[in-house]
């Protein structure tokens, strides 16, 4: 199974984290009252109300995550949803789409960092329900300022417009992190000027998570 097939095999297109390498997602058959069905780990996790964000945050991934959040709310609006995160970050607008949906749906969203939650993914980690933002002990959290994804060309006025948008995005991110952590906007602004790496303990002290897990 190649990377494209693996991505298609996962529910909602949620493929494994990291570059598009060959990766086999195990599947097996289960017998039900309706007959035999083929399942994979992502299906089983979803049935347990677990969403696994193990890729860069793209528009397609955001759509898949939002669909799962809305579907799980429709199935039971009172049961907690868990979101496991191992992501290098990605699109800011894709992140805000997930962020707003997390705040829109009725169930509490538990967030758990496995490995890394960087950039946009760190904001999603911190956006979980208070008291339910968790991390495994050796995970890493990275926060930093938004950046342009590619070289910018064009007229000076166009570049000025883009700069204004980046500053707007930065202020929005600062407010999101300040709300989640209890840190002042001024402190957040200072800290994200450069890459700020945090251990699980450092993320807890900073207010990005609430506790460190020793087992799941």
Curated annotation (Swiss-Prot):
- Pfam short name (any one): CLP_protease
Superkingdom, taxonomy of origin: Bacteria
Q: Does the keyword Hydrolase apply?
A: yes
Which Gene Ontology BP terms does the record give? protein quality control for misfolded or incompletely synthesized proteins
**Could you tell me which SUPFAM superfamilies the record lists for this protein?**
ClpP/crotonase
Catalytic activity, EC: 3.4.21.92
Q: Where in the cell is it found?
A: Cytoplasm
Active site (catalytic residues) = 119 (nucleophile), 144
Q: Which cysteines are joined by disulfide bonds?
A: none
Q: Which UniProt keywords apply?
A: Cytoplasm, Hydrolase, Protease, Serine protease
Q: What reaction does this catalyse? A: Hydrolysis of proteins to small peptides in the presence of ATP and magnesium. alpha-casein is the usual test substrate. In the absence of ATP, only oligopeptides shorter than five residues are hydrolyzed (such as succinyl-Leu-Tyr-|-NHMec, and Leu-Tyr-Leu-|-Tyr-Trp, in which cleavage of the -Tyr-|-Leu- and -Tyr-|-Trp bonds also occurs)
Q: What class of enzyme is it?
A: hydrolase
The answer, when asked if Protease is one of the entry's keywords, is yes
Question: Mind listing the GO molecular function terms for this protein?
Answer: ATP-dependent peptidase activity; ATPase binding; serine-type endopeptidase activity
Gene Ontology cellular-component terms for this entry are:
cytoplasm; endopeptidase Clp complex
What this protein is reported to do is described as: Cleaves peptides in various proteins in a process that requires ATP hydrolysis. Has a chymotrypsin-like activity. Plays a major role in the degradation of misfolded proteins.
What does the record note on quaternary structure? Fourteen ClpP subunits assemble into 2 heptameric rings which stack back to back to give a disk-like structure with a central cavity, resembling the structure of eukaryotic proteasomes.
Q: Which HAMAP family match?
A: ClpP
The UniProt similarity line reads: Belongs to the peptidase S14 family.
The identity of this protein, by name, is: ATP-dependent Clp protease proteolytic subunit 1
Name of the gene this protein is made from: clpP1
